[in-house]
A protein has these predicted regions:
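Structural recognition of the beta-strand scaffold that forms the well-ordered cores
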Residues: 84-85, 93-95, 115-117, 156-159, ...
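Extended C-terminal subregions enriched in glycine
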Residues: 89, 126, 147, 180-181
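Cysteine/selenocysteine-centered motifs that mediate thiol-based redox chemistry or coordinate metal-sulfur cofactors
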Residues: 120-166
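Extracytoplasmic/secreted cell-surface and envelope-processing proteins
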Residues: 104-105, 125-126, 176-178
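Short, solvent-exposed loop/turn segments at the edges of secondary structure
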Residues: 78, 109-111, 138, 150-154, ...
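Internal maturation/activation junctions in enzymes
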Residues: 2-99, 106-112, 119, 126-136
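A short acidic/small-residue loop/turn micro-motif
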Residues: 100-102, 172-173
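Alpha-helical support elements that line or immediately flank enzyme active sites
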Residues: 170-183
């Protein structure tokens, strides 16, 4: 921008296109921070900004119908942890554990000091209604005695000739599948 000069046609065009995208994000991601968690870190992330400007054309305006809010980058989960360990004898473990939401169920086990999760949210409580992460699931995932909820956790160990060759897993809730798929 500095080489284009202040208020040059190129600079004004770039600023206008950036402002249009910011305004589209404003309508969806901004609000009173006392009532709404504003995703400041995600909105100001360099990768997010680069993605927002990926359809920028320096020679013409982006059609207004194409200027929508951006898709926020998945934030690193504060509630889900994955670890993979191999010892000297080749014993391997791949573990993913989660609270699901901040502070899980908000219930601490007396005398133990750890929180219980709220994985019940991963069941379908009402068909057609989203859970806390916006996922809508069908009746096949309805709550039932002894039933396990649908989960995206995929701690994985690949074996080669009977020995652990690759172990992987990741936090990320509903984005776990796409992260694992890329490996």
């Amino acid at each position: 921008v500095s080489e284009w000069g202040h208020n040059s046609a190129k600079t004004v065009h770039l600023m206008t296109e950036a402002e249009r995208r910011v305004y589209a994000d404003r309508a969806v991601y901004l609000g009173d921070p006392d009532f709404f968690k504003v995703p400041i870190a995600q909105l100001t992330n360099d990768l997010y900004v680069k993605e927002r400007m990926s359809n920028f054309n320096p020679s013409k305006a982006t059609p207004s119908m194409e200027v929508r809010e951006g898709i926020l980058l998945a934030a690193e989960s504060e509630q889900t942890t994955h670890l993979s360990i191999v010892d000297q004898q080749g014993n391997a473990v791949s573990v993913t554990t989660t609270l699901n939401d901040s502070y899980g169920s908000r219930v601490v086990v007396a005398g133990s000091g750890f929180l219980l999760n709220n994985e019940m949210d991963d069941f379908t409580s009402k068909v057609g209604s989203p859970n806390m992460f916006g996922l809508v699931q069908g009746p096949q995932n309805a709550i039932a005695p002894g039933k396990r909820m649908l989960s995206s956790m995929t701690p994985t160990i690949f074996l080669e000739n009977g020995s652990a060759a690759l172990m992987l897993g990741t936090p990320g809730g509903s984005t776990i599948f796409t992260s694992i798929y890329q490996v």
